Amino acid sequence: MVPLSFPFHVAELEVGQHLYWQIGNLNLHGQVFISSWVVISALLVLVITGTRKMERDPQGVQNLLEFLWDYLRDLAREQIGEKAYRDWLPFIGTLFLFIFGCNWGGALVPWKLIELPNGELGAPTADINTTVAMALLVSLSYFYAGLSRKGLRYFEYYVEPTPIMLPFKIIEDFTKPLSLSFRLFGNILADELVVGVLAFLVPILVPLPAMFLGLFTSAIQALIFATLAANYIGEAVHEEHH
């Protein structure tokens, strides 16, 4: 727990408290699961509402979903390639929507109104466990993509154009999930802390610009994560890279 205190008890903000769920020998961060389920439920409601009565002339939620589908399809096609992007479009789209929902949910939903025995609710992506799990999932995905498309020939990538590159390619495989996870975690946590501190110090109007900037940053971070995930998968399946 890292306390942030201010003189004369003007404000106090604590970071690092968690609601733990004990399952066997495992300690799970309960507030992350709760807020994640809220985001997933909201996304399911959005998708069901937009696809329940499909119309040839889309309007409302259907129009929004079709716009997102077209945008993510173009992103996946550009990064992965024409031959393989269809297999990975649902994965890339799910990543983007979940991260976007988590980021915006952390900024817009009044989580502090929900009292917990310990800790407080917030954006799931402001917890390092969430971002590391998604980054490792991306790593497993591009390994699977390369092996399923090329078989053992995939490992030729590690010794091309010369075997001297082998240790550097291995290090790169470790740095990819690290950069993905810490970039997303750091940006979302920093945004929550900045808005939280400003809200404690000057609760009227002043935090609004920081909150709007946080919404923009949150959307960009979701796009960056999805784009890099698609790019890594594209590198694994493209013949010219191996």
From Swiss-Prot:
GO cellular component: organellar chromatophore thylakoid membrane; plastid; proton-transporting ATP synthase complex
Example GO biological process: proton motive force-driven ATP synthesis
Xref: SUPFAM superfamilies: F1F0 ATP synthase subunit A (SSF81336)
Keywords from the UniProt entry: ATP synthesis, CF(0), Hydrogen ion transport, Ion transport, Membrane, Organellar chromatophore, Plastid, Thylakoid, Transmembrane, Transmembrane helix, Transport
A GO MF label: proton transmembrane transporter activity
Main location: plastid
Domain of life: Eukaryota
Transmembrane segments: 28-48, 89-109, 128-148, 193-213, 214-234
InterPro entries: ATP_syn_F0_a_bact/chloroplast, ATP_synth_F0_asu, ATP_synth_F0_asu_AS, F0_ATP_A_sf
Location(s), subcellular: Plastid, Organellar chromatophore thylakoid membrane
Residues in coiled coil: none
Pfam families reported for this sequence: ATP-synt_A
Membrane topology: Multi-pass membrane protein
NCBIfam families reported in the protein's UniProt record: ATP_synt_6_or_A (TIGR01131)
Job description of the protein: Key component of the proton channel; it plays a direct role in the translocation of protons across the membrane.
UniProt cross-references to PANTHER family, sorted A to Z: ATP SYNTHASE SUBUNIT A, CHLOROPLASTIC (PTHR42823:SF3)
Family statement: Belongs to the ATPase A chain family.
Quaternary structure note: F-type ATPases have 2 components, CF(1) - the catalytic core - and CF(0) - the membrane proton channel. CF(1) has five subunits: alpha(3), beta(3), gamma(1), delta(1), epsilon(1). CF(0) has four main subunits: a, b, b' and c.
Protein name: ATP synthase subunit a, organellar chromatophore
Naturally occurring in which organism (per UniProt): Paulinella chromatophora
